[in-house]
Amino acid sequence: MQAALMAFFMLLFSLLSLLGIAANGFIVLVLGREWLRYGRLLPLDMILISLGASRXCLQLVGTVHNFYYSARKVEYSGGLGRQFFHLHWHFLNSATFWFCSWLSVLFCVKIANITHPTFLWLKWRFPGWVPWLLLGSVLISFIITLLFFWVNYPVYQELLIRKFSGNMTYKWNTRIETYYFPSLKLVIWSIPFSVFLVSIMLLINSLRRHTQRMQHNGHSLQDPSTQAHTRALKSLISFLFLYALSFLSLIIDATKFISMQNDFYWPWQIAVYLCISVHPFILIFSNLKLRSMFWQVLLLARGFWVA
């Protein structure tokens, strides 16, 4: 890839990362302020603040890793820093996947019009489970991180006491990253993705049928209620697309199909981090509380800039 084109993709990745960190940070600050003021949060806000915190940290860790690795490839590839980065990245990525899944389940039980007794029972019970599910997600992510640490323990040990040669460390990393990690990551990420997929498809189907029923009963496309359901459908479909893109990108990334030396590395990193950078804006504009605060901040910034 030409140097100018690579610089363009690096700049695009940087801008996307800054926007993602800013949007996720905004969600955390707004909801954190409300938490401090009232001493509690609604189940939806609990998930949003957890998701915003994990996504922002994940985006920050990924950005630092990509630019540090591109600047010091040889030293970083065989050093201890790379191993510790992966531990942080696996923890944050796993937590983010689970938080997204619980967000889709909460949307489903709150909005979907399904009369099955099991669904009605879940609709009643799920909001009360949210704090424990979030805590459980953090615990699961920590256990998964320990699992990766255990698999990589010989590398950490030998890097610390300097018995491995750089070549032997590289061979060990290549072996476990080629044969062990891809299958392990596929299993770990497929569980929350399956939960997400089932709940989001149930919700999309319910909203689609409800919108068609409203149009059949004489509601026009310009009717406020119809427009609200149409906007909700578009938001959910966008969420589904971004989450699926993130899942597929991470699975392919786990196979090391596209390495740092590959010409398409930076475009690929844009695809990997697209969901955690773009979806926060969808959440902000679809949430009345976050949207109103966002416009207030923009007006304040505009007034400060003009002054």
UniProtKB/Swiss-Prot annotation:
Keywords: G-protein coupled receptor, Glycoprotein, Membrane, Receptor, Sensory transduction, Taste, Transducer, Transmembrane, Transmembrane helix
Any one GO MF annotation of this record: bitter taste receptor activity
Transmembrane segment boundaries: 8-28, 41-61, 89-109, 130-150, 184-204, 235-255, 265-285
Top-level lineage group: Eukaryota
Function: Receptor that may play a role in the perception of bitterness and is gustducin-linked. May play a role in sensing the chemical composition of the gastrointestinal content. The activity of this receptor may stimulate alpha gustducin, mediate PLC-beta-2 activation and lead to the gating of TRPM5.
Protein family: Belongs to the G-protein coupled receptor T2R family.
Additional facts recorded: Most taste cells may be activated by a limited number of bitter compounds; individual taste cells can discriminate among bitter stimuli.
Protein name: Taste receptor type 2 member 41
Origin species: Gorilla gorilla gorilla (Western lowland gorilla)
